[in-house]
Each structure stands twice: as C-alpha cells, then as structure tokens.
Amino acid sequence: MNHQTVLVTGGAGYIGSHACLELLQAGFKVVVVDNLVNSKLESLARVQQLAGKALSFYQADIRDKQALTDIFAKEAPDTVIHFAGLKAVGESCALPQLYYHNNVYGTLVLTEVMSAANVKQLVFSSSATVYGESASPQYSEHFPLGAINPYGRSKAMIEDILRDLSASDRLNKVEKPWKIALLRYFNPIGAHDSGMIGEDPNGIPNNLMPYVAQVAIGKLAQLSVFGDDYPTRDGTGIRDYIHVVDLVQGHIKAIAALNAEHFAEGACKAYNLGAGRGYSVLEIIDAFQRITGKIIPYQMSPRRTGDLAECFANPALALAELNWQVEKDLDDMVNDTWNWQTKNPQGYQ
C-alpha cells in the first residue's frame, strides 16, 4: 500500500482527472487544486466513484499564494504533479499576457510555496510544443528548443525556471534539493474505458480527436483539414497521438523514478511521452469511420501558420529511465473516445 500524498494542480481537467484516477487506484492519497476555469467538478465525482476512494479537493488558483500555503500546511504532500495551465495555442496568440501570467507566474508561485514547505519533488506537464523546427520529424529530448507560439514559450520558460531551481540547489548544496521530471506530451487523446471521464472542451474543440467525435455525433457539421499538400504519405499533417491513460501512467512511473535512489539529487530531467510513431489527419478520420460506422464530412482548408508537416516522439529515454512505454493503439484511442462521446454527448453537463 502506498502512503504517499500527491498534490495535483489542475486535477479536474482532462489529463488531470485521468491521473487522479490512476493515482487513487495505485494507492496514493490525492489532493486536487483546481480553479475550475476550464474544468468541471463532476469529473472528480466520477473519478472517486470509479476508484471507490475519496480525494481532497480545493477550489483555488495556483497564483493565490496564501491559499496554496494553507493547503500545503494542511495536506503535507510528498510530490506535486503540475497540470494547471491554459493550453490553447490559438488563444495564446490572441492573449499572450493571460498565458504568461497564468502559466509562468502561476508556476513561480507554486514553486515558492513548495520551497517554503520543503516539498521538492515535482512532475511537470510540459509539451512537445517546446521544440523548434528540426531536420528530423522524430524529436529527441536533446533537440534544440524553439517554441513558436506563446503557449509553447510559456512551457519552455517554465522548463527553464525549473532547471534553474534544481541548478541553484546543487550550487548551494542544500540538504534536500529539487528532483524534477519534465514530461513533454505529444498529442493526448482517448478516454478512460468506462466512458465516465474524458475530454470535455469548452466551446469548439481545439484538438482533432474531440472535434472528429463531435462531427460524428452531429454536434458539429464538418471537419476542416488544414493542409493537404504537406510532404507526407497522404499530404496531411502527421502527429504522434498517445492514449491519455498511457500518458498518466507515465506520471506514475515518473513519481517512482523521483522516489528512487538512482534519480540524482538536484536533477531536472526531460522525457518525451509519445508513441514514437505518427498518424495523419486522414488516417485518424479513416480509423474513426471504420470503428464507429459514421461518416465524417470534411473539407480541405489552407495550411495553418506554424504547423509542421510531421512530428513524433523518440520515447526511448522514457523506456530506459522510467520503464514506460505506450500499451494502447489507435483503435483503443478511437474506441474510448467514441464510448465517452456517445455516453456523454453534452460532456459533463
């Protein structure tokens, strides 16, 4: 039985709620901090129902230092998983100050509170958007960073801050230095196979899979495919899609690594969480049509500025150091997305 307490920021969100379920099932005590701006409390009610266990919930913003300080004093977490943050690329271009204030300043406040409470184990929800353009479509952790939008830059800035924190602890030879895992997600999709929790975006979905699902169920009329002239096997963009349950298992493996003696004191390490292969937009549409029996109407549209032709992970480091790899395939992702969508056509409403 695991008696560790994990504080999860943004725990009511899409990835956060799935992480809370896996943590509870793995025996962790779970404390959630979420401002519910982009999430619904119903997700956590369902998580507790599925797990048959309770978690602690605090409605608070990570920028509220006093609220966080009080929560840390009361709950005494051992590790923090930091999901909280705004995540829409397009919105970040329109509202960069909001993204930097929420994501970067919010993380600064969180780490200040963690330092004061001497909680120095952190798993950070980073993103493949921190990478710059590369000659290779397969991205490894040592590749140069060069985010091209405010969302990606906010994640890259946070990575820099966390690396600086760990370096300062090594420099100052503090007794309990930071141990940090930066998990760079590729494209999380899917849902828990119960169909009780899943992705419930506000308004029009920004991501491909929930958009396709809403077209399939009739909520949206058709899908726009941005670009059909890329140098790829069918002309459409190729991305690395990862099942959300595989993704959150990576966080549990990361906590185990941080707890282990071999994870160096004061280390801050980045890991790609991806499948290591890509699917094109048309391949996603074809899989959805094949599995659901629904026709997905789509139209070809011009490329979006800044979109890469092809991008997928080299996940070898996560396998070697975290003992993590994906177990679910594209059919699982589509089946579980469709199961969630059909059982919850209005999301958590």
Q: What does each model-identified segment do?
A:
Residues 193-197, 236-237:
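Short acidic, glycine/proline-rich loop/turn micro-motifs
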Residues 208-349:
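C-terminal substrate-binding subdomain of Rossmann-fold SDR/epimerase-dehydratase oxidoreductases
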Residues 60, 72, 99, 142, ...:
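Pocket-edge positions in alpha/beta enzyme catalytic cores
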Residues 1-191:
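N-terminal Rossmann-like NAD(P)+-binding domain of SDR-like oxidoreductases, especially those catalyzing
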Residues 100, 148-156, 198, 202-206, ...:
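Short-chain dehydrogenase/reductase
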Residues 190-192, 229-230:
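Short, basic/glycine-rich phosphate-binding loops at helix/coil junctions
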Residues 172-175, 194-195, 261-265:
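Short helix-coil transition/hinge motifs at the ends and kinks of transmembrane helices
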